[in-house]
Amino acid sequence: MKCPFCGHAATQVIDTRMSEEGDTVRRRRRCESCDRRFTTYERIELFFPAVVKKNGSRVDYDRNKVKDSMRLALRKRPVSAEAIDEAIARIEEKLLSHGEKEIGSDRIGELVMRELKRLDKIGYIRFASVYRSFEDVSEFRDMLDEFRQ
């Protein structure tokens, strides 16, 4: 690997460690020319399906959009950041396991709702009330009745 300090092509790996999650390899390297040390990280490159929005446009999957929407729904609720990250990991696992090149934003919304329902009932209701775009109180009441069953 090329040294970021002097540009020399020959570097030596002096230490390799696996992350706790097992998805990243951390390597300490030493340049054979300038003798400086640096760290590199090796991760699996995942290709998520393109997201097809309601208007038909396509955008890249964005983990941060999912995370932000879940955080908003769970604002001031007793749910840890770690629990949110684990829920997102389950959502992403489902997205990758289907092996499809495209997925509708509505499908992602349903996956988010399923995870929120497991994490926090109030967060689920908050998200569903925005996601489902209720027109009147009766639709909201129907959703609550469905939720109680």
Swiss-Prot record:
Any one GO molecular function term: DNA binding
Pfam families tied to this protein: ATP-cone (PF03477), Zn_ribbon_NrdR (PF22811)
Zinc finger motifs (unnamed), residue ranges: 3-34
GO biological process, one term: negative regulation of DNA-templated transcription
InterPro entries referenced in this protein's UniProt entry, alphabetically: ATP-cone_dom, NrdR-like_N, RNR_NrdR-like
Residue span, ATP-cone domain: 49-139
Role: Negatively regulates transcription of bacterial ribonucleotide reductase nrd genes and operons by binding to NrdR-boxes.
Name assigned to this protein: Transcriptional repressor NrdR
Lineage of the organism: Bacteria, Pseudomonadati, Pseudomonadota, Betaproteobacteria, Burkholderiales
Gene label: nrdR
